[in-house]
Amino acid sequence: YVHLTRFSGEVKLGVLDAEFTLPGGIRKHSGLRHVTLHNVTVGDNCCIENIQNYIANYEIGNDTFIENVDIILVNRLTTFGNGVEATVLNETGGREVLINDKLSAHQAYILALYRHRPELINRMKAITDYYSNKHASTVGSIGDHVMILNTGSIRNVRIGDYCHICG
């Protein structure tokens, strides 16, 4: 179940025992076809095929289906979007919110509208900076039961379980 595949760096493969049933009733066996993997861990029963360039520096979960993608890579130490400033309430000016993957609506509200409490805002920013640095990595992750189809470039992204990305 491995055809026309190149490996470099450290690559770990899980078992390839299952089949995927796609919309329309087409069945594909798990495996690797037309793909280059560099420093990748592939979980059990994944189907990865027709990757135009390569997949580099990722841990791919179990039962994941990836097909017709240009490139998937982490190319440096990244925080995966944590700690990035997003400007909100543009009409009021100076209302940046540091986003993170645990951000709640309540936290965003406080960060945007409680500028008159600079001690609170500075402490919340410090917590976000700490969280961002703690979760920074040179290896990305694609969760279990993920489907990625017909997509261009995916760079420096953490993809959670059961996510569907269709281009």
Name these PLM-found stretches:
Residues 1-167:
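Domain-scale signature associated with acetyltransferase and cell-envelope carbohydrate enzymes
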